[in-house]
């Protein structure tokens, strides 16, 4: 994924991680996973509940936070 593609993704996932926001992650096959984002990189998200699961980003359809998240995007206009 290019840097432009991650201008929203990385700050969003990082805010969820830093603020320990509970999330529901829906996979492309319809399965719902719940937990807290522990870490992430270009390809995977580590989701923690009773255990830590490594979820591949290409399998994720939607990430739904349990509450609103404040994003601070420094370089919005490019």
From Swiss-Prot:
Homohexamer. RNA chaperone that binds small regulatory RNA (sRNAs) and mRNAs to facilitate mRNA translational regulation in response to envelope stress, environmental stress and changes in metabolite concentrations. Also binds with high specificity to tRNAs. The keyword Hydrolase does not apply. The gene is hfq. PROSITE patterns: SM. Keywords: RNA-binding, Stress response. GO terms for biological process: regulation of DNA-templated transcription; regulation of RNA stability; regulation of translation, ncRNA-mediated. GO terms for molecular function: RNA binding. InterPro entries: Hfq (IPR005001), LSM_dom_sf (IPR010920), Sm (IPR047575). Residues 10-69 form the Sm domain. GO terms for cellular component: cytosol. Coiled coil: none annotated. Belongs to the Hfq family. Gene3D superfamilies: 2.30.30.100. It comes from the Bacteria. This is RNA-binding protein Hfq.
